[in-house]
């Protein structure tokens, strides 16, 4: 499972860079764990070059050319890919059980499903494996004769799975009579801060979008002992904000320069992020923190980004190999739809009843002020598995 978490986190950073190429000046928010899980469902049905490309993009491939990989990374990838598909799927099953464990101090609702044109029936073995490893049931539907109705049914199901927070995943005209197969993935997250902000301290302050433009935001504030880390080579300060019970943390990376985000995005890798956010890199400070309230609801058709990363055959009618999924030829993936919902407010990552715990013993720590008033990166991490559940860039209120 540790190897899978590393793969998901590596995919997170690579995918973030790919999205950033076509999203200059715009917010980004997605779930690498969610996307990886959804694509792994598809991967289980592939063979040949289609499977190889997916494994490489998802970072669990023993690719032929390891020359650019350090020895430890070669060994990890070889070990992870040396077994059968079932071993990888089993790791996803174990990871999901940990992340979605009943009794967790947060709410995470997911909607993962494959919809295939009914003239391409699924193998029974594939259906059984999907239920075993992912608790999922691929749906055979009539895109040819009822694509509009199918779109409504998909949106209704996703809405019900996400507590009504994501009601319209598929936009108009996103599926039609030529659609062969679509993959949908949506996530809704609600968490409560370990130390909540007081609503009475929230005031309007400027958020500097760039050197010449500011926008007013509702800026939360609190003074609390928090863990801070410095990235000297990139002139960036990092902050860890725990959620209740410390199951999850929000890791925030703020460049010192207003226009420093692009340099940070270019330089960041999974290995660097793992090093920066390790316990021995963090120091405890008495922090006067100013953090904007914000809401992000981002939708992506992932086809373009995934093709750009090298996952091309899966979208090609002449090249896609889904022979582990169906006996019919010419089945290919039409689209991948991903949508996430996030709200950062005084109580946490979406308004929820509850009270934040107070520190009972004050740590004698140096004081600093951290004003998050210009573009930054953030990650929501599951601490036990070190898996990045969500990855985001906030640069425009």
Swiss-Prot record:
It is found in: Nucleus; Cytoplasm. The record marks 362-363 as: Reactive bond. A motif (Nuclear localization signal) lies at residues 74-77. Pfam families: Serpin (PF00079). Keywords: Cytoplasm, Nucleus, Protease inhibitor, Serine protease inhibitor. GO terms for cellular component: cytoplasm; extracellular space; nucleus. Its main location: nucleus. One of its GO terms (molecular function) is serine-type endopeptidase inhibitor activity. Protease inhibitor that may play a role in the regulation of protease activities during hematopoiesis and apoptosis induced by TNF. May regulate protease activities in the cytoplasm and in the nucleus. Belongs to the serpin family. Ov-serpin subfamily. This is Serpin B10.
């Amino acid at each position: 499972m540790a190897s899978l978490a590393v793969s998901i986190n590596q995919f997170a950073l690579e995918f973030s860079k790919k999205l950033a190429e076509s999203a200059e000046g715009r917010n980004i928010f997605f779930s690498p764990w969610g996307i990886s899980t959804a694509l792994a469902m598809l991967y289980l049905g592939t063979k040949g070059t289609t499977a190889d490309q997916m494994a490489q993009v998802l970072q669990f491939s023993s690719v032929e050319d390891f020359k650019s990989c350090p020895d430890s990374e070669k060994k990890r990838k070889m070990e992870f890919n040396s077994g059968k598909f079932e071993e990888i799927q089993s790791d996803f099953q174990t990871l999901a059980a940990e992340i979605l464990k009943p009794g967790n101090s947060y709410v995470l609702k997911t909607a993962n499903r494959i919809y295939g044109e009914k003239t391409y029936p699924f193998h029974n073995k594939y259906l059984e494996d999907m239920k075993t490893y992912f608790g999922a049931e691929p749906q055979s539907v009539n895109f040819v004769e009822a694509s509009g109705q199918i779109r409504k049914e998909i949106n209704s199901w996703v809405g019900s799975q996400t507590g009504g927070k994501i009601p319209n995943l598929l936009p108009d005209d996103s599926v039609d009579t030529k659609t062969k197969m679509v993959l949908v993935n949506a996530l809704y997250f609600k968490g409560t801060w370990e130390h909540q902000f007081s609503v009475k301290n929230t005031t309007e302050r400027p958020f500097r979008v760039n050197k010449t433009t500011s926008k007013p935001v509702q800026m939360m504030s609190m003074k609390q002992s928090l863990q801070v880390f410095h990235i000297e080579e990139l002139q960036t300060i990092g902050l860890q904000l725990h959620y209740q019970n410390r199951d999850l943390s929000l890791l925030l990376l703020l460049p010192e320069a207003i226009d420093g985000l692009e340099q940070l995005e270019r330089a960041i890798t999974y290995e660097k992020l793992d090093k920066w956010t390790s316990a021995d890199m963090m120091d405890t400070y008495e922090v006067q923190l100013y953090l904007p309230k914000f809401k992000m609801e981002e939708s992506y058709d992932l086809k373009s980004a995934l093709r750009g990363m090298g996952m091309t055959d899966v979208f090609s009618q002449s090249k896609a190999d889904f022979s582990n999924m169906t006996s019919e030829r010419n089945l290919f993936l039409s689209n991948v739809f991903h949508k996430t919902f996030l709200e950062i407010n005084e109580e946490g990552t979406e308004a929820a009843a509850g009270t934040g715990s107070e520190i009972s013993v004050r740590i004698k720590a140096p004081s600093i002020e951290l004003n998050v008033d210009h573009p930054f990166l953030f990650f929501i991490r599951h601490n036990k598995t070190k898996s990045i559940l969500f990855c985001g860039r906030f640069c425009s209120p």
